[in-house]
Amino acid sequence: MNNIDQQEVEKFEKMAKTWWDPQGDFKPIHLLNPLRLAYINDKTNGLFGKKVLDIGCGGGILSESMAGLGAIVTGIDMAADALLVARQHAESNHLNICYQQITVEDFLKQHCITDTEKFDIITCMEVLEHVPNPHSIIQSCKNLLKEDGLLFISTINRTAKAYMLIIIGAEYVLKMLPKGTHNFEKFIKPSELLRWCSQEDFECKEIVGYHFNPLTKNFWINKDINCNYIAVLQNS
């Protein structure tokens, strides 16, 4: 199955060289990463020794952070240039991360996944709003996760607030993101996400919002999910 938006892939390919520049195109991810890493580590009772699949890993910011805490990480993405950057950066930091240029659907097809080969944790951060068929990714995650394994999905709610803050604010006013990074029509309401997850027998353990203060440059988590949000889902 081809669950790829080539324009989205090309968009991120053009920014590949700036993945590890904390002041570059991916500055928001660098600012957000400590918060989401701590959140994932807390909800999983520690990442050490656990098998993790990072879908849409890009240049490897989250993948490296999880590997640094002792996780056994596989990162997949369709942007070849970003993966080249990810491999080089991991090697320079002496981290053993398996990076592959493949969709999660094809990853599932090409690997004979036994129960022992399945993952304890899957992360899918800021990916669903960039693909044609988000539900397809969730279906694949179902078959790649161990029983009781955890799936972390972060995406953006399709609300007026999200449009103003993410597209107008972050892309045009603050210029934290390149213009055109997001398409409002691809934003996903929590009700839509949870319906897809329910159809695959995932149980939602928690859903929270995360927010950015442009003055302090800090992110924080609360219960407001009208903009960016992250869901923790357990495979049942």
From Swiss-Prot:
Family: Belongs to the methyltransferase superfamily. UbiG/COQ3 family.
Disulfide feature: none
E.C. code: 2.1.1.222, 2.1.1.64
Keyword Transferase set for record: yes
BP GO terms, sorted: methylation
Pfam families named among the record's database cross-references: Methyltransf_23 (PF13489)
UniProt name for this protein: Ubiquinone biosynthesis O-methyltransferase
Pathway(s) the chain acts in: Cofactor biosynthesis; ubiquinone biosynthesis
Top-level division of the source organism's lineage: Bacteria
Reactions it catalyzes: a 3-demethylubiquinol + S-adenosyl-L-methionine = a ubiquinol + S-adenosyl-L-homocysteine + H(+); a 3-(all-trans-polyprenyl)benzene-1,2-diol + S-adenosyl-L-methionine = a 2-methoxy-6-(all-trans-polyprenyl)phenol + S-adenosyl-L-homocysteine + H(+)
